[in-house]
Amino acid sequence: MKRIISLLFIACPVLASAAPDNDKAAVQAVIAKYYNRPLAAHKCQLAKPPKDSETASDNIMYCMKPVADHTVTRNGKATRYVLYTGFAYDMQQKVKQDAHASSGLAELFVLEKADGKWAIKQHGSDEIGAWGEPSENKAWKFVQVGAQNWGYVAESSYTGQGDTTTSQNFLFTDDSNRIRKSLIINGNDNGAYYGNCD
């Protein structure tokens, strides 16, 4: 029985794998060119908040670093899914913005190779987290979301006025070749609102 199970694992094709190192530097160079705003003090690239952002200050940008990189075959082509996350950074004060209501940022880049060069085909972002930070790097999971679509998901939570809401936050490609974001609430606890019944 153990041999049969082992053979099944060997025979099954790997649909998604960690990206090979030989292309990683080339992919990161393409993304660095997209950002084109390095912040040497934190060894990151600066990104503006999304257009639909609720960020109150014009001074806030995000200090982005690579978190995950996976290769899949999508619609018959080798495709890279690269996730960057970053903390909120106050450009005027030159410090991390760590207010409770400040979120971090997650950005998904989808790249395809043409004529031996990687190019960004889709890009999308979402504000996520609290205290100026996104979900921890280890929290992000690579998931398949449909026959030819993949993305990343992480759990995040926010507490305000004693009420904590927990959610699964997705960034993924859809059949229209766009990056979508989705939030599924999977927990709520308002016990602190009532003083934990003390």
Model regions: which residues?
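Short Lys/Arg-enriched alpha/beta "domain-start" segment
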Residues: 19-55
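Short beta-strand elements that form the blades of beta-propeller/WD-repeat-like
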Residues: 80-86, 90-92, 96, 149-157
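Beta-propeller blade signature
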Residues: 101-113, 167-175
